A protein has these predicted regions:
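Phosphate-group recognition and catalysis centered on beta-loop-alpha active-site segments
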Residues: 2-536
Length: 536
């Protein structure tokens, strides 16, 4: 009887202990899930400042400001704070070292790069056992092969995803593509196969692509990112892989300008990032600068060619301040010609380019400089370079010129090769606004932008590294639309800026602008027009 009672009491104690254990596991898992949602999951909202818990953890508003560091165990003593650490994990011991370090150092997250499957499950179980001690972001990364692709050094996707989902699911995935040659880009079949693997995931996924191939791979990568707002991009490099070691600032900018900025992270050496951050200021997207996704919401002011109007403009709400630049002859033979803000036929002004840039550069407004002659380009760009190097330009800068002959006129533009060469040699970190000379004939016999016109323009623009916008005359847009669509499709770095003369004497219909609005991407067409012609 006593033995039976002991067995019963033992069973009760065991059941109680097991219940407590399971309750502890449940609470720990719940807490982990909450922390995972807080630290790891990335959701796109309307307000940029709350898009990413990664950004929230580091108290940042923009991934461009996040610091990454590739490190080995020998770097443990020198790894700094406020950064994501990308570390290769080859054993449970290595994982323990980095987890311990992340707990000690303020504001450090871990990106765990697994190079083989043998340690993955062991490390995931170890993460699960220590989940209550994890108070920092953890990303689990593997370079994966899909559909039995034979990619040297890659993990098999099916096994990689299965191990994580069944062992430690409350984590952020990161999957990478390993280029094995300079032409080994991310192709459409790869991203479609990857999407089949990840489309039912509850957690966010980072796609990691080498900087050296990101521009050539951009269309399929962008397609994948558009499938879900829970998919994010990390552009990276690898010093150990020759084909992944090149970093172009303008390739990074090309991608950044074509997405909401919160969706692109940069695991790039700080030396490259410093140059990139500077380029992203003057050659960055005005939409990023103002926190918009709709180019029609950008507002403009024109012909700011004297000090009085300049001061009025600074007090106004216009986002873009535009002015024409001329080089004026000196009053005496000893003086050097200087660029001023003036629109022909006026050739005098109390506002020169240097003062204009110094005052407008940090005003919170974007700048557009319109050049009517080649002589004023070089001295103006040297001023831009000088002032920008001192931090005096903190907003996007557009450089505009008509470089080709366009509809309804025989007037020639500036020499395209000379104009572009000066920009690329003096200060290339700008958006190029490349247009055609045009006229509007009151007789009504107006033609639009022909296919040869846009093809010639594309031959110039497609060779450029910078973002390019094409200013097109509003009265000619509707009849040219098919050709302009063709032009836009040649590069994701292209946009249109629809303009009309000031004061407007062209026959421009709101209906035509609404047509353009309804048949284009909101981020790809700017409307530099009177308010009554802005489409909704």
């Amino acid at each position: 009887m006593k033995v039976k009672l002991y067995y019963q009491l033992g069973g009760v104690v065991f059941l109680f202990g097991f219940t407590v254990y399971m309750l502890h596991r449940y609470i720990s898992a719940s807490r982990l899930e909450e922390r995972s949602l807080e630290l790891l999951q990335v959701k796109i909202q309307d307000e940029p400042s709350i898009h990413s818990p990664l950004l929230k953890f580091f108290r940042l508003h923009d991934p461009i400001d996040m610091k990454w560091q590739h490190a080995s165990s020998s770097d443990l003593g020198i790894v700094g704070a406020n950064r994501m650490m990308a570390v290769d994990i080859d054993s449970k011991t290595t994982l323990n070292l980095w987890m311990h370090h992340a707990r000690k150092v303020k504001d450090v997250g871990l990106k765990l790069n697994f190079k083989n499957m043998s340690v993955l499950e062991t490390c995931l179980l170890h993460l699960d056992d220590n989940n209550y001690n994890i108070h920092y972001p953890v990303i689990v990364h593997g370079d994966v092969a899909l559909d039995n692709a034979e990619e040297q050094g890659a993990l098999f996707a099916d096994v990689f995803f299965y191990k994580i989902r069944t062992t430690y699911p409350a984590v952020t995935f990161s999957v990478g593509h390993i280029p094995s040659s300079a032409t080994n880009t991310v192709h459409q079949l790869y991203v479609e196969a990857l999407w089949k693997q990840i489309r039912n995931f509850k957690q966010p996924v980072f796609i990691t692509v080498c900087a050296s191939v990101i521009r050539m791979s951009w269309l399929p990568v962008r397609w994948l990112l558009n499938q879900s707002k829970d998919i994010f991009l990390i552009i990276t490099y690898s010093s150990s892989n020759y084909f992944c070691s090149e970093v172009s600032v303008f390739d990074l900018l090309f991608v950044r300008n074509d997405l909401p900025k919160e969706r692109v992270f940069f695991d790039i050496p700080e030396a490259n990032m410093d140059r990139f951050r500077k380029a992203a200021v003057t050659a960055g997207s005005p939409l990023h600068y103002f926190g918009l996704q709709d180019a029609a919401k950008i507002t403009w002011t024109h012909r700011v060619t004297n000090m009085k109007y300049f001061k009025e403009t600074m007090k106004g709400d216009a986002m873009f301040i535009e002015s024409d630049v001329l080089l004026v002859s000196p009053d005496s033979k000893d003086d050097t010609a200087i660029p001023i803000m003036a629109h022909p036929p006026d050739v005098r002004s109390d506002l020169n380019v240097k003062d204009f840039l110094r005052m407008a550069g940090t005003s919170g407004k974007c700048i557009k400089l319109d050049f009517k002659d080649l002589e004023s380009v070089e001295p103006s760009l040297r001023l831009v370079s000088e002032i920008s190097s001192d931090g005096g330009i903190t907003a996007p800068l557009w450089i505009n010129a008509d470089i080709l002959t366009g509809p309804n006129t025989d007037k020639t533009g500036l020499n395209a090769s000379v104009f572009l060469s000066k920009i690329n040699s003096i200060f290339p970190e700008v958006t190029l606004s490349l247009g055609w000379t045009t006229e509007w004939l009151r007789t009504g016999d107006n033609v639009g932008y022909s296919l040869p016109m846009v093809q010639t323009m594309n031959r110039h623009a497609i060779l450029l590294r910078q973002p390019v916008t094409f200013p097109v005359r509003a009265s000619l847009v509707r009849k040219s639309w098919d050709n302009l669509v063709w032009l836009l499709r040649q590069s994701r770095g292209y946009s249109l800026t629809i303009w009309t003369p000031f004061p407007n004497e062209d026959a421009v219909e709101l209906e035509d602008m609404q047509f353009v609005r309804n048949h284009s991407e909101a981020a790809k067409v700017y409307f530099d027009l009177p308010q009554e012609l802005i489409p909704t």
